[in-house]
Swiss-Prot record:
The keyword Amino-acid biosynthesis does not apply. It comes from Arthroderma benhamiae (strain ATCC MYA-4681 / CBS 112371). Its main location: membrane. It is found in: Cell membrane; Secreted; Secreted, Cell wall. A lipid is attached at residue 203 (GPI-anchor amidated serine). Belongs to the SRP1/TIP1 family. Residues 204-231 form a propeptide. Residues 1-17 form the signal peptide. This is Probable cell wall protein ARB_06477. The GPI-anchor is attached to the protein in the endoplasmic reticulum and serves to target the protein to the cell surface. There, the glucosamine-inositol phospholipid moiety is cleaved off and the GPI-modified mannoprotein is covalently attached via its lipidless GPI glycan remnant to the 1,6-beta-glucan of the outer cell wall layer. Residues 121-204 have a biased composition (Low complexity). The lineage of its organism: Eukaryota, Fungi, Dikarya, Ascomycota, Pezizomycotina.
């Protein structure tokens, strides 16, 4: 009895699996990423259907990439595979009846010409890692460059200030010392001249015999001598 029920269930499942069968061209479907391919099937269920792109080796009710959801079951769909599909991967297109998901069908397995992707999560993870690395490098450059430049800018400023101060002190001190010395010398000369001029004044009382004759002018002396000769 159980064997009969199992066979009956298998037969019903086989009939259900034949719903909306694909019309495969001679030689099978040829998919590539450069031009679209038209899928054709024989509509056998009313309402709408959903098309999914599945990996042939791993098919579950929740797996696959949805190509079209709630599509009118007209028996045709144009499909252009994306280039990031896995290279040399085996794919199949699944058609599912939206009213009864147990009614589905598949195309024969195929490979996509022009696909360049790696494993399913490979390209996404790789791109995220590269972006993070570039952001870190740019941040490191922005932080390091100004820090190493600013100390070198401060050093010349300090040196210039020291040189300027030393020059100012030296220049100011030298003229001042020279002027003071010159002034002292001038003062000494003036003092000497004053002393020389005042020497006759500070002498004792003049000699009556010598001082008068020395003080008389030449004309007056001649007159005096003439008077003395007349006497």
């Amino acid at each position: 009895m159980r064997s009969v029920l199992y066979l009956l269930f298998t037969a019903v499942a086989a009939v259900a699996a034949l719903e909306n069968p694909f019309l495969v061209p001679p030689g099978g479907y040829q998919f590539n990423t450069r031009e679209p391919t038209v899928l054709n099937w024989q509509p056998t269920t009313p309402g709408t259907v959903t098309l999914k792109l599945q990996m042939s080796s791993d098919i579950t009710p929740h797996s696959g990439l949805v190509l079209a959801a709630h599509l009118e079951n007209t028996g045709t769909f144009t499909f252009l595979p994306p280039p990031d599909l896995m290279q040399n991967g085996l794919y199949t297109v699944q058609i599912i009846d939206d009213n009864d998901p147990s009614k589905y069908n598949f195309t024969p397995s195929f490979m996509v010409d022009g696909a360049t992707g790696g494993p399913t999560t490979g390209p996404t993870t790789s791109r995220t890692s590269m972006t993070t690395s570039e952001a870190t490098t740019t941040s490191g450059e922005s932080t390091t460059s100004p820090s190493s430049t600013r100390p070198s800018t401060v050093s010349p400023t300090t040196t210039d200030s020291s040189d300027t101060t030393m020059s100012t002190v030296t220049s100011s001190s030298t003229p001042t010392t020279t002027d003071s010395t010159t002034t002292s010398e001038s003062t000494a000369v003036s003092s000497t001249r004053s002393s020389s001029t005042g020497m006759p004044t500070s002498s004792g009382a003049p000699d009556p015999n010598g001082a008068v004759s020395l003080a008389l002018p030449g004309g007056l002396l001649s007159i005096v001598l003439s008077l003395m000769a007349l006497l």
